[in-house]
Amino acid sequence: MISSLLSRSSIARRAVRGFASTAVQLDASAKLNKPARFAQPISASDIPKGFVVSSTYAGIKAAISPKPADPNTSASTAAASNPNPKPDLALIVSTVPAAAAGTFTRNVFKAAPVVVSNQVLLDGAKKEQGARVQTVLVNSGCANAVTGTQGMQDAESCVELVKKHLAPHPGLAQSSEGRETLLLSTGVIGVPLPMPTIKRCIPHLANGMILRSDPESWRETARAFMTTDTFPKLRAKTFKLGGKEVRMIGIDKGAGMIHPAMTGPAVPSAVSSGQLHATMLGLIATDAAVQPKALQVALNRAVSRSFNCISVDGDMSTNDTIILLANGQSAASSSTAVANEIDESSPDFEPFVSELTAFCQELSKLIVRDGEGAEKFVEITCTNAPSYTVAHGLLSRLVTSMLFKCAIHGQDANWGRILASVGGADPSLTKDVDASKVSVSFVDPTGEFESITVLRDGNPVKVDEDEIGKLLTKEDIKVVIDLQNGKEDCTYWTCDLSREYIEINADYRS
């Protein structure tokens, strides 16, 4: 009799939760409208001085699609059905050679553009003036990854084409020093770039007449980064260093194949595959004057607390790259002047790192917000850990747990999945975790609902299922894991796993 009543009670709870979940999902569908909520305009006054951009539609994905063209559809008819296609090829140019830094995927199967860009920064670091770059070429639709010798040749051809066709632009420095080009590619893996298409479009992009630096041009450039993204991820801001105004602008993309673990430029033998986790790409440009070595240190620190702390589906891309350019034009008296550069000993270095880190976190969280099919945004903090490495490693394990992500999607406070995942991490991470000290809480970042502790000092806490159920209906949810065994902390950002994620990735190449 008792077991029968318990069974009926369980069925009733599931039914109520099911009705509530359906209602919330319908409500979420109406509210999610990510482009309207997160695609923000930028102010012209926040655009860094000395950078110009151009973009165009090349038809890259259409050129490599395995889906045969409809013989009954003419080219003119196809064009008419999509009169304003999304750009898929873009050029970002600094009017003077800019200090450059980058972080790149640790995936063993690094894409050709990653290898080429990594080498440019390595070679530049050996020079007296450090790594200097003037242009970045971006394409979406084709990753140029796992494409063998042909892929490397195509990447190098892109660099040469940009050098050849970059027309003189008003104020564009013509010195041969520092006129290097970096590459960013995203899209389908295992297919070569459609070089006839690329060769046709680069001269157009490099034409000084269309290189501009207005908000709309930057927005179109951000759209050129997009694959399964639902909105262009573009942000810009102005801040002060040493009492002087400097500007920073950033573009990133990503919605799937997101679990970066990037490192700075390194020779292949010096980088392990790490934790093998659509590609995450990012470009940040500032008119602050920062010495290249210091710029790389700043980017490494910022990325470790931002882009390397996000996950959508646990898969590391072959193409993950973040590029940072600093051209020093904020304090320039002319288009070719470069102010004294900040180094690691400068009083402005730590403030710059702080501003950069906050900016990277803002950009990286947009990727999670736009996670393929995502309906929930989850912030997870591991506090009082013995080291940052331990905290980061435990969270990196948790955010790849399909059971945890499904529970979040279903608004089910099944906190046992959190502990099962964290506890199953590598022994090198868990050896200093004392299960009898761990506490877990669910938090509403908006403050509408009170925080609810479900585990305290290793012991479960009886909670009101209705109250925690209400908290989990929120779009934004925070989970706090307190190890009570140190002073370090780490925060990760992830999303739920929905049916739409499967639908998107089942049809990715078509």
From Swiss-Prot:
The alpha and beta chains are autoproteolytically processed from a single precursor protein within the mitochondrion. Keywords: Acyltransferase, Amino-acid biosynthesis, Arginine biosynthesis, Autocatalytic cleavage, Mitochondrion, Multifunctional enzyme, Transferase. The record marks 278-279 as: Cleavage. The record marks 186-187 as: Involved in the stabilization of negative charge on the oxyanion by the formation of the oxyanion hole. It comes from the Eukaryota. The keyword Nucleotide-binding does not apply. One of its GO terms (biological process) is L-arginine biosynthetic process. Substrate binds at residues 227, 253, 279, 372, 505, 510. Coiled coil: none annotated. It is found in: Mitochondrion matrix. Pfam families: ArgJ. One of its GO terms (cellular component) is mitochondrial matrix. Its EC number is 2.3.1.35, 2.3.1.1. Transmembrane segments: none annotated. One of its GO terms (molecular function) is glutamate N-acetyltransferase activity. Catalyzes two activities which are involved in the cyclic version of arginine biosynthesis: the synthesis of acetylglutamate from glutamate and acetyl-CoA, and of ornithine by transacetylation between acetylornithine and glutamate. Heterodimer of an alpha and a beta chain. Belongs to the ArgJ family. This is Arginine biosynthesis bifunctional protein ArgJ, mitochondrial. It comes from Mycosarcoma maydis (Corn smut fungus).
